[in-house]
């Protein structure tokens, strides 16, 4: 969908015409940033204001599958202002429940949480706080507790560290290969996402 009009306007049309995949509860958006020293994906950057633990688990698994299609091995961190149970925040409890659900549905997925953003990207810090963490190395799929935190984190990283080089957003949960561009999309990103849609369409044939 084009870079004119709002994201949710396009999403409404997609929902009416294409709909969600069988069994999918919700849509979500994943953006990938090509930073100097790492490639990082963030979800959800555009859709869910206050997702449930079940919805977060669903689109975490979907985002990991999308990364594998791009030949990226997902290493997932569930983010919160709570750090492995150190805080009493609602987002921390929600992300801990999401972790349980993801481990039930995709036991092969390398994932841990809930954790601060610095712990997700700094293994030494993470292991100092939780030596038994099941996540090794740097996380490359950052799952945020709501769309506000996801969108803010994405735009800050894109501008300050990513040189405005980004891929996405990838729409997760739709019953066809379809993506929604944002008003800040460059020509390069439009071409990239058109190519991604073709790759996704070929994959489901």
Task: Identify the meaning behind each predicted range.
Residues 1-136, 140-205:
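Anion-binding alpha/beta catalytic cores of soluble intermediary-metabolism enzymes, centered on
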């Amino acid at each position: 969908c084009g870079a004119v009009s709002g994201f949710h306007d396009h999403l409404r049309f997609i929902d009416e015409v294409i709909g969600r995949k069988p069994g999918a509860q919700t849509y979500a958006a994943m953006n990938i940033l090509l930073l100097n020293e790492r490639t990082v994906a963030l979800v959800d950057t555009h859709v869910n204001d206050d997702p449930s633990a079940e919805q977060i688990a669903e689109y975490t698994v979907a985002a990991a599958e999308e990364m594998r299609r791009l030949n990226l091995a997902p290493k997932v961190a569930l983010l919160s202002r709570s750090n492995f149970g150190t805080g009493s925040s609602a987002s921390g409890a929600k992300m801990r429940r999401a972790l349980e659900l993801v481990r039930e549905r995709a036991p092969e997925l390398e994932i841990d949480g809930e954790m601060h953003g610095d712990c997700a990207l700094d293994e030494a810090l993470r292991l100092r706080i939780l030596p038994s963490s099941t996540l090794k190395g740097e996380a490359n799929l950052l799952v945020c507790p709501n769309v506000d935190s996801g969108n803010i984190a994405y735009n800050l990283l894109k501008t300050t560290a990513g040189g405005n080089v980004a891929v996405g957003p990838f729409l997760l949960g739709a019953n066809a290969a379809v993506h929604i561009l944002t008003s800040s999309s460059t020509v390069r990103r439009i071409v990239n996402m058109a190519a991604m849609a073709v790759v996704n369409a070929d994959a489901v044939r």
